Amino acid sequence: MPVEENYQPLLQEEEERAYDSDEKVLIIGVDSDTESGGSTVLPPFSWKKLWLFTGPGFLMSIAFLDPGNLEGDLQAGAIAGYSLLWLLLWATAMGLLVQLLSARLGVATGRHLAELCREEYPTWASMVLWIMAELALIGADIQEVIGSAIAIKILSNGFVPLWAGVTITACDCFIFLFLENYGVRKLEAVFAVLIGIMAVTFGWMFADAKPSASELFLGILIPKLSSRTIQQAVGVVGCIIMPHNVFLHSALVQSREIDHNKKDRVQEALRYYSIESTTALVISFVINLFVTTVFAKGFYGTELANSIGLVNAGQYLQDKYGGGFFPILYIWGIGLLAAGQSSTITGTYAGQFIMGGFLNLRLKKWLRALITRSCAIIPTMIVALVFDTSEDSLDVLNEWLNVLQSIQIPFALIPLLCLVSKEQIMGTFKIGPILKMVAWLVAALVMVINGYLLLDFFFNEVTGVAFTTVVCGFTGAYVAFIIYLISRGFTCFSRCCPSKQIEVE
């Protein structure tokens, strides 16, 4: 039987890569008449080039605005008032540092974190890292899809139940696939619109609430932390660094066509990615600040503060601030829907890179996206059916999901910091001793904070001899694997990467 000309095999013959060459945004050639492509001198700044590089940072910033972060914001505002705004600022700065290192890894090597983990670690360790990354992604995806489903329920006046909202949200996978066929810039434009919707809706709420400007600035400038607000402080930091986002950003930066063998081109890409990532996270900080201050103004010091959560936040806002020209309940619902939809799509995107990178799956992208979406949507549907009528149970589940993601953070941060520190991997773009020390201090701080969250949670939730034994056994294996990853980081990676030096023609 003759093979049809339009037939597309499910398996690709070449090795898995983040983007095919025909999918990348062309950078080489812009202002080429004024640049000496092989020079070691950094080309002059160009607004046109900044525009061409703009996109990956905004996709990355979605993880700072997902429903899990919004819940952390509203609880911090309701319970701690304005006092944790300084921590939100510094947590965002720490998140920016981690994401810039992730981008640096992707630009300098031409490969993303999942690929490098597969190549540089033994097979067994690589598989453990993959499983941990997938678990973190599934946990994040459940929160994101449930957040969208809650928003749909709000906007439909309760007519659409959670399970139906989950089904509707699951269809965004196919919208994402459709958009990607028209180019990565179209997809990035959609995310820009969704971020704009969040900025407008939460900014509208901020304007309606009229929070105290003096208390706001004092909260940002003066560090303050009491024993009563430690849990909210841990939540603020814990929500900022998402394991799957570290993998995602190192892949997103490869959507631009640059010559990785020319030092000036790599330096130029790093400069523009640093500018656009910083801009994106400044915007995300402002949006998170809007949410925190609205709930600080409305609920701090009230009896409702300890009971507020993502499920009932809209109704509490409506009761506090009233209807007005456009009811604040629906403004909140629209912003929450934009947050849930955008983060769900980026979760699907991250799932493709994680699965493809660790397993070297040479599948067509639509099939890989379908597989990753199915892995996440099935447990989410079960959650929606079980917890549809129980708000308290849904909040407890959310705590467990936060714990699940906190457990995974070292398995993204440690490989990243080890890889960007090695000349065998990064060549001349390895991080220097000062940046290395700062990065490890940030990573240690994040892991200690999340460790506190885990200990506090397990002391309160783990009961019974059998359950305690299982948790202790898991903890021992967990700590041992972290020690292995750190110790390996002080040895040379040499399985697949001989000493790499950037050549300048």
From Swiss-Prot:
Gene Ontology cellular component list: plant-type vacuole membrane; vacuolar membrane
The organism's place on the tree of life at top rank: Eukaryota
Membrane topology type: Multi-pass membrane protein
Tissues where the protein occurs: Expressed in roots, stems, buds and leaves.
Catalytic activity: Mn(2+)(in) = Mn(2+)(out); Fe(2+)(in) = Fe(2+)(out)
Entry annotated with the keyword Membrane: yes
Keyword Transit peptide: no
Annotated TM spans: 50-70, 78-98, 127-147, 159-179, 187-207, 233-253, 280-300, 321-341, 369-389, 400-420, 439-459, 466-486
GO molecular function: cadmium ion transmembrane transporter activity; manganese ion transmembrane transporter activity; metal ion transmembrane transporter activity
InterPro entries assigned: NRAMP_fam
Subcellular location: Vacuole membrane
Entry-linked HAMAP family: NRAMP
Protein name: Metal transporter Nramp3.2
Gene behind the chain: NRAMP3.2
